[in-house]
Amino acid sequence: MPSVSVWVRSLAPMTTWTRAAIGALGEDLAVKHLDSLGMRVLERNWRCRYGELDVIAEDPAARAVVFVEVKTRTTDHFGGVAEAVTPQKVRRLRRLAGLWLAGRDERWAAVRIDVIGVRIGRQATPEITHLTGVA
């Protein structure tokens, strides 16, 4: 498979993309980033009646389960990654993480919530910002 930058450059112009397609691309790039860090993705787009968790991964180095919120941007109009995660969003992520954990037999030494921001379109290569342990 070609590198991420070649793959992204070969896609159609961003102006023709739907929000869902841009979000899916951002999640794919976030998963590749997590893989490069040695993390193992357990689930993607886990849903329940209270919402959705974008990516659930295991960080073997920290013996932690990591709930990852992915924010994909094509402009800076909506602020950066840190501004995208409000206290209300953190509360929702914690609640969803608790529900996901309640349905599992496996236990981890730690639970963490990370945010990955993916900025597409400003440069030839997507910009990835990974904030660890936001909650």
UniProtKB/Swiss-Prot annotation:
Signal peptide: none annotated. CDD domains: PoNe_Nuclease. GO terms for molecular function: nucleic acid binding. Gene3D superfamilies: 3.40.1350.10. Pfam families: UPF0102. InterPro entries: Restrct_endonuc-II-like, tRNA_endonuc-like_dom_sf, UPF0102_YraN-like. Belongs to the UPF0102 family. This is UPF0102 protein Mkms_2031. It comes from Mycobacterium sp. (strain KMS). The lineage of its organism: Bacteria, Bacillati, Actinomycetota, Actinomycetes, Mycobacteriales.
